C-alpha cells in the first residue's frame, strides 16, 4: 500500500471500514497466535499425561513475561510514530522506529539471560512439583531462554508496521509463524522425537516457528522503510532524542506493566490452584488457554483501533477520533457476548479439544474441573474488553499516567485481592469467579479514566 493510501486510511476512509482494515488482520494474527500456543497444549494433551499439561501451563507465565518487553518498545514506539504521522513529522519518526527495534533486542537478551540463571527457582515458585518440573524446564529452555529475542523483536516489528498502516503485513508474519508451528508440532512430537519427549519436541517446534516469523518481519520492515516512517538502520538510531525516548517510555511502560501484572496474577492463580491439586492446576491451565480467544479478539480490535485514534488525536480531528472509539467499543462488546454464549454452551466440547471426553480416572476429573472453571471465567469477556479498549485509547493519546493507574488498580488492588479472598471462602471455584468479578469492577475505573481524559480539550491540541 502506498503512502497516499495510508493517508486515506487515517483521514478519509469511513471509520468502520478503517477500523476493520486495521483490526481484522490484527485479530486474525492474535487468534492464530493463541491457537498455536494452544496447539502445544492440545498435542501434549494427546499424550494423556496431565503432568505434561501442567508442566507446560506452569511455563506459560515465564513466556508471557516477554510481552511487557514487546509492549514497551512496540506499543510505546508505535503509538508515538502514529502521533508523529498525524502531526506531519513522519520523517523524524525513523529515529523512534530504530530506537524501538534495538531497545527490544537489548531487553530481550537481558531477559533470556536472567531466566537462564534462575529458571529452576522461578519454576518452583510458580508451583512446579517433582512430577511437573522436568516438563516445565524443557519448555522454558527452548521457548523462553532461546526464543525470547525472536518473539520480542517480532512483536515490536508487528506493532511498528501496524501503527503505520501495514496491518496486513504485520499479521502475515505472526500468522505465518503460528501456522508453521501447528504443522511442526505433530511432526516433531510424534515422528521425529521418541515417546516421553513430547514437551521438548513441542518447544523446539515453537522456537523454529518464532525464528522464521522474525526473519519474515525483519525483511518486510527493511523493504517498506524507503516509503514509510519505519527504519532499523543504525544511522537513524544515532538521531534519536531524549524526548523521544521519554515519550516511548511514557506510553510503553504502562503497556509493559499490564501483562507483567497479569503474569504476577497468573503466578498467584497457579500457586493457589496448585494447593488444591495437580489436576485442578492442569484444568485451569486448559481454561487459561481457551479464555485467550476472546482476549485475542478484544486486544486485536483495540490494537487495530490504536493508530487511527492516535493519528486523529495528533491531527486534531476529534470527531473522527471519538467515532473510532465509540464504534470500536460496540464491535468489541458484541463479540465478547458471542464468546460467552459459545463457552457456556460448548464448555465440555471445547475442553475436550485437550482431553478425551471419554477418558476415565484422572483425565476425566481434569475435564470436569476445566469445563466448570471455563463456564465461570468466561463471564469476564465483555468487561475485559472494556478494560483493554479504554486502556489502548489512553495509550493512543499518550496518557501514560492514566494507563498506569488503571493497570495497577486492575491487578494489584482488585483482581489479586479478590482472588485470595474468594479462594479462602469458596476454594477452587472462588479462584475461577475472581476473574469476572475483578474485571467487572475494573471496567468502571477504565471508563471513568477515559471519559476524564476526553473532557480535557487542551490535551487534544
Label the predicted regions.
Residues 31, 35-53, 123-130, 187-197, ...:
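Helix-terminus/linker motif at the lipid-water interface of multi-pass membrane proteins
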Residues 26, 30, 42, 79, ...:
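Transmembrane alpha-helix boundary and packing residues in multipass membrane permease domains
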Residues 1-23, 81-147, 194-253, 309-379, ...:
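Short alpha-helical transmembrane segments in multi-pass integral membrane proteins
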Residues 44-64, 130-137, 199-200, 243-251, ...:
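Interfacial/gating helices of multi-pass transporter permease domains
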Residues 74, 143-162, 170-178, 202-218, ...:
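Short runs within selected transmembrane alpha-helices of multi-pass transporters and secretion channels
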Residues 11-42, 46-47, 61-76, 80, ...:
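N-terminal transmembrane alpha-helices
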Residues 21-40, 177, 209-213, 217, ...:
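Transmembrane helical elements of multi-pass membrane transporters/channels
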Residues 53-113, 151-170, 283-347, 384-406:
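Small-residue-rich hydrophobic transmembrane alpha-helices
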